Amino acid sequence: MTKVLVTGFGPYGVTPDNPAQFTAEALDGRTIAGATVVSRIVPGAYFDSIAAAEQAIAEVDPQLVIMLGEYPGRAMLTVERLAQNINDCGRYGLADTAGKVLVGEPTDPDGPVAYHATVPVHEMVLAMRAAGIPADVSDAAGTFVCNHLMYGVLHHIATQNLPIRAGWVHLPCLPMVAALDRNLGVPSMSVETAVAGLVAGIEAAVQHSADTREPVPSRLQI
């Protein structure tokens, strides 16, 4: 049976409740398009996150990896197209959960500049929209631990020649976090809505080994 590994992060920075954790946990054990979902919460720290994901890949032996993270300020699910070989959380005024601040450092000095997601990004976005969930394609995964982990997992898969497809979905803040005084006006999305979008997206990823070449209208500005 096909297995899908879903990863999420716990609290970090000024985010006390991470939608990636709650969404990953809600998906754990589900069967989607005949595939079993196995979720793992990984550390929100540079390099530790990659090591934990590599261990989960070895244990679960998935055919598909979908990684989740929060992107404050975005109003919809965003499926990332690229992961860069650069880390810079100093620009955000943030440290990772181990207290580490990286500024302009690569994830792997010998690795390529970037990796493309190997999931059908357009098909996933179209499936999410068809399910009534706002979603878009993104070409900017940031330079914090989300981008770092996406790059690290894709690099691991490529260098180990593993038969695994992998990609990243960013989630808006949770309503309970957007309701905090410091976050008023920040877009949010409930766990239930995010889960519905991920179910549709994972189904598309399981069913489509190649992406559509049809253009996907985009409104993403950040």
Swiss-Prot record:
Xref: InterPro entries: Peptidase_C15 (IPR000816), Peptidase_C15-like (IPR016125), Peptidase_C15-like_sf (IPR036440), PGP-I_bact-type (IPR029762), PGPEP1_Cys_AS (IPR033694), PGPEP1_Glu_AS (IPR033693)
Compartments, record wording: Cytoplasm
Active site: E80, C146, H170
Entry keywords, A to Z: Cytoplasm, Hydrolase, Protease, Thiol protease
Enzyme Commission number(s) of this protein: 3.4.19.3
Principal subcellular localisation of the protein: cytoplasm
An example molecular function term from Gene Ontology annotations: pyroglutamyl-peptidase activity
Reaction(s) catalysed by this chain's protein: Release of an N-terminal pyroglutamyl group from a polypeptide, the second amino acid generally not being Pro
GO biological process assignments: proteolysis
Annotated GO CC locations: cytosol
Superkingdom, taxonomy of origin: Bacteria
tRNA-binding recorded as keyword: no
Keyword Hydrolase: yes
Family: Belongs to the peptidase C15 family.
Quaternary structure, from the entry: Homotetramer.
Described function: Removes 5-oxoproline from various penultimate amino acid residues except L-proline.
Protein name: Pyrrolidone-carboxylate peptidase
Lineage of the species this protein comes from: Bacteria, Bacillati, Actinomycetota, Actinomycetes, Mycobacteriales
